[in-house]
């Protein structure tokens, strides 16, 4: 009788324990992504990002990554690093950038974005919209032929 009760308690504890989904980019977990060499990482990217990486990131992107590393090392333990501002909207998000806070320029101001694992392989510009989405109001006079019959205010 006691064995059945212990078994029931153990099963209840297992159900209670929440399992969190670990992030995987193309089947490779984040910890393993950080350990991959540049060539192995490039093989995981989609064609456009792969071509960009093979042609080289360039001096501006390298300088940006150095600033991100510096901000991460200077950040206190268990705190977000300082924001690193950039105009590089065409920068591909790499695994080492995860956890950083980036100010992405949209043509007018810098939008602060915290880099999450789901963003790997995307461009920075995808997370800072450059236009203000329209909010359509009521149609004005002359919008359509039927608007002639709408009484004026």
Swiss-Prot record:
Q: Which Pfam families match?
A: Ribosomal_S19
Q: What UniProt keywords are attached to this protein's entry?
A: Cytoplasm, Nucleus, Ribonucleoprotein, Ribosomal protein
Q: Name one GO biological process term.
A: ribosomal small subunit assembly
One GO MF term = RNA binding
Question: Residue span of the signal peptide, if any?
Answer: none
Top-level taxon: Eukaryota
Location in or out of the cell: Cytoplasm; Nucleus; Nucleus, Nucleolus
Q: Does the keyword Cytoplasm apply?
A: yes
The UniProt entry, under Gene3D superfamilies, shows: 30s Ribosomal Protein S19, Chain A
Give any extra note attached to this record: There are 2 genes for uS19 in S.pombe.
Looking up PANTHER family in the UniProt record yields: RIBOSOMAL PROTEIN S19P FAMILY MEMBER, SMALL RIBOSOMAL SUBUNIT PROTEIN US19
Record's function text:
Component of the ribosome, a large ribonucleoprotein complex responsible for the synthesis of proteins in the cell. The small ribosomal subunit (SSU) binds messenger RNAs (mRNAs) and translates the encoded message by selecting cognate aminoacyl-transfer RNA (tRNA) molecules. The large subunit (LSU) contains the ribosomal catalytic site termed the peptidyl transferase center (PTC), which catalyzes the formation of peptide bonds, thereby polymerizing the amino acids delivered by tRNAs into a polypeptide chain.
Q: What is this protein's record name? A: Small ribosomal subunit protein uS19A
Q: Supply the source organism for this entry.
A: Schizosaccharomyces pombe (strain 972 / ATCC 24843)
Q: Which gene encodes it?
A: rps1501
């Amino acid at each position: 009788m006691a064995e059945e009760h212990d078994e029931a308690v153990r099963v209840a504890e297992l159900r209670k324990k929440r399992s969190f989904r670990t992030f995987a980019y193309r089947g490779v977990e984040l910890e393993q992504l950080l350990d991959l060499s540049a060539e192995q990482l490039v093989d995981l990217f989609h064609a456009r990002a792969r071509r960009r990486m093979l042609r080289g990131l360039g001096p501006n992107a390298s300088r940006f990554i150095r600033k991100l590393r510096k901000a991460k090392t200077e950040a206190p333990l268990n705190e977000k690093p300082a924001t690193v501002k950039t105009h590089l909207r065409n920068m591909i998000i790499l695994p080492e950038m995860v956890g950083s806070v980036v100010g992405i320029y949209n043509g007018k101001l810098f939008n602060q974005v915290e880099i999450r694992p789901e963003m790997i392989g995307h461009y920075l510009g995808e997370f800072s919209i450059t236009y203000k989405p329209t909010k359509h109001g009521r149609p004005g006079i002359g919008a359509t032929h039927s608007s002639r019959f709408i009484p004026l205010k």
